[in-house]
């Protein structure tokens, strides 16, 4: 008969620090609740909850009000009937090196690590859990100021399309799952700050330290999340390139991006329009609704660009000075021009690029 999980609360334990745990050879197992995992998790980790949210809340209450022994006893009674099922969900990964984590490197991850070890798994615990990972990420982000080439231009000019195609780029909107506009969440599931920062760290921490990185010009906030302060500062100091394209080209690209032809998309777009009344006035918003209902999408987009997006862009960028201006009518040619500009940049100096200077 298999021992109860409480028998694995003490004993020898193999553990590693965050920097080791993030190596590609590790398979990360998050034993926190699905709610905790959703709120913030190490990118790529697999969620195998030991308890659900209600059970965890109950155990925590017992721990605070009665004591550790009562909490452990209740936790064991919850887990025991499900232990075989829990184990079976992890069997497909038995040949891999597993790293188990919970919130702070406490009882959940320790007991599971020892239990899996007794079952023949190669397994280790992440010291300090997700909290230690968050510290690690934030320590990196607070000083991350790489040399940047920042693409600017009006809405629809093709900045995001170029960022997706350029080597050595960071797609902030993809990391945030938001296009950084009033309609930016259509077709997407915006991420929260913790998950955005985790993915940002994963994308940037292994990049060459002195090479210029392409990034799209953004405000500090992208949808629901904020760009790390040090990186936002690097964007202000980076090489600035202005991209230009005709109204016709911009409308076509926006239409291809949003493809507002299905009923659900049209409903989401129409639901956002009332938020524009203060900027555009009631009459223009009603005109936009009419065009949407008539499937006159090109006219709909043109009015939004002329009356909303372009004036806001001109106001926000009026004091900018650019290192280069490029046509973005032919994105393949623009990409070649940008790569040429990148190649012409000197490798960032010997001084640490993360410094404040």
For each feature predicted by the language model, list its residue ranges.
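Short glycine-/polar-rich loops that comprise or flank the Walker A/P-loop
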Residues: 43-44, 146, 234-239
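Glycine-rich phosphate-binding P-loop
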Residues: 108, 147-167
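Conserved nucleotide-sensing/catalytic segment adjacent to the nucleotide-binding pocket
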Residues: 167-234
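Conserved NTP phosphate-binding and transfer environment spanning the P-loop NTPase/kinase superfamily
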Residues: 234-239, 244-357
């Amino acid at each position: 008969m298999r021992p109860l999980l409480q028998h694995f609360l003490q004993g020898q334990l193999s553990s590693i620090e965050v920097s080791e745990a993030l190596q590609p050879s590790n398979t990360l197992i998050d034993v926190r609740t699905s709610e905790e995992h959703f709120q913030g998790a190490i990118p790529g980790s697999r969620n195998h909850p030991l308890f659900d949210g209600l059970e965890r809340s109950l155990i925590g209450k017992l721990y605070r009000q009665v004591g550790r022994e009562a909490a452990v006893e209740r936790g064991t009674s919850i887990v025991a009937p499900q232990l075989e099922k829990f184990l079976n969900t992890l069997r497909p990964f038995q040949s891999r090196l597993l790293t188990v984590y919970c919130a702070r490197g406490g009882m959940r991850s320790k007991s599971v690590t020892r239990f899996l070890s007794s079952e023949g798994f190669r397994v280790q615990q992440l010291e300090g859990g997700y909290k230690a990972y968050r510290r690690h990420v934030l320590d990196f982000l607070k000083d991350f100021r790489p040399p940047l080439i920042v693409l600017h231009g009006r809405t629809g000019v093709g900045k995001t399309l170029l960022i997706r195609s350029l080597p050595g780029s960071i797609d902030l909107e993809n990391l945030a799952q938001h296009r950084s506009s009033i309609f930016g969440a259509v077709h997407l599931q915006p991420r929260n700050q913790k998950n955005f920062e985790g993915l940002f760290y994963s994308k940037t921490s292994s990049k060459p330290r002195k090479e210029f990185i392409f990034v799209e010009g953004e405000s500090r906030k992208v949808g629901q999340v904020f760009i790390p302060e040090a990186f936002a500062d690097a964007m202000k100091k980076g090489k600035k390139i202005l991209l230009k394209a005709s109204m016709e080209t911009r409308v076509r690209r926006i239409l291809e991006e949003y493809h507002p032809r299905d009923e659900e998309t049209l409903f989401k777009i129409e639901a956002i329009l009332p938020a524009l009344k203060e900027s555009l006035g009631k009459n223009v918003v009603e005109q936009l609704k009419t065009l949407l209902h008539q499937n006159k999408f090109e006219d709909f987009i043109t009015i939004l660009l002329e009356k909303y997006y372009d004036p806001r862009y001109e106001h926000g960028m009026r004091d900018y000075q650019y290192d280069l201006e490029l046509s973005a009518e032919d994105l393949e040619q623009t990409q070649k021009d940008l790569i040429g500009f990148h190649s012409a940049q000197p490798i960032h100096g010997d001084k640490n690029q993360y410094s404040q200077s």
